[in-house]
Amino acid sequence: MDSYLLMWGLLTLIMVPGCFAELCDDDPPEITHATFKAMAYKEGTMLNCECKRGFRRIKSGSLYMLCTGNSSHSSWDNQCQCTSSATRNTTKQVTPQPEEQKERKTTEMQSPMQPVDQASLPGHCREPPPWENEATERIYHFVVGQTVYYQCVQGYRALHRGPAESVCKMTHGKTRWTQPQLICTGEMETSQFPGEEKPQASPEGRPESETSCLITTTDFQIQTEMAATMETFIFTTEYQVAVAGCVFLLISVLLLSGLTWQRRQ
């Protein structure tokens, strides 16, 4: 019965003058480790009235909330109401308790760079208020022209290559979402892009045998260089001593020759 009522609501939305809105066929694209959020909702957007487990919609309640309005003001039409599945005559009004607000999974993103507040623009509704015993996940039916914004979840950082947003557009009679240019990577991860060289392995990352071989080879080279240096030093010292001896002998011969020449005179 609910499915027939929902179909009737969709047909009414499309056929009533002034309420025409082209629904997007698919959901916004999913990005790994990222969530999306609409900062404002275009007129014609619908939100299913879903209740958490153990609760159901009241019989006279609406199946969905609808963003409607005029050129100056837009708001959500209808209200979602949930009642306990075990109690038929108990109807609970829309005033969520603080504990239930904490339990409810919110789709709102906390971003330091918020896009332009579209809710201040004509033809847009703000985030609809929560209702008591609401389901943990909200299901929206977006219309053409809707924009959603993406943000990485906690523990991941964004690598931007372009706009981190997706827009529902009509192309050749079919609706499609543009692909957001966002990549989310872990805080400790290093992404490998084309043209980026891998870091060379350090000696600490090599096997023990290879490291030992490297150290042994290096030590041998150092010892060989030290031995060659020592031999050069010894050879140089011996050469200097020999030259000094020759010079001393030459001086001695000259002195003796001079003394002998003086005695003869």
UniProtKB/Swiss-Prot annotation:
Residues 195-209 have a biased composition (Basic and acidic residues). Disulfide bonds join 24-67, 49-80, 51-82, 125-168, 152-184. Receptor for interleukin-2. The receptor is involved in the regulation of immune tolerance by controlling regulatory T cells (TREGs) activity. TREGs suppress the activation and expansion of autoreactive T-cells. The keyword Signal applies. PROSITE patterns: SUSHI (PS50923). It comes from the Eukaryota. It holds the Pfam family Sushi. Non-covalent dimer of an alpha and a beta subunit. IL2R exists in 3 different forms: a high affinity dimer, an intermediate affinity monomer (beta subunit), and a low affinity monomer (alpha subunit). The high and intermediate affinity forms also associate with a gamma subunit. The keyword tRNA-binding does not apply. Keywords: Disulfide bond, Glycoprotein, Immunity, Membrane, Receptor, Repeat, Signal, Sushi, Transmembrane, Transmembrane helix. GO terms for molecular function: interleukin-2 binding; interleukin-2 receptor activity. Residues 1-21 form the signal peptide. Residues 260-265 are cytoplasmic. Residues 87-123, 190-210 are annotated as: Disordered. Glycans are attached at residues 70, 89. This is Interleukin-2 receptor subunit alpha. It comes from Pan troglodytes. GO terms for biological process: immune system process; inflammatory response. Its main location: membrane. PANTHER family: INTERLEUKIN-2 RECEPTOR ALPHA CHAIN, INTERLEUKIN-2 RECEPTOR SUBUNIT ALPHA. Residues 22-240 are extracellular. The chain crosses the membrane at residues 241-259. Residues 22-84, 123-186 form the Sushi domain. It is a single-pass type I membrane protein. One of its GO terms (cellular component) is membrane.
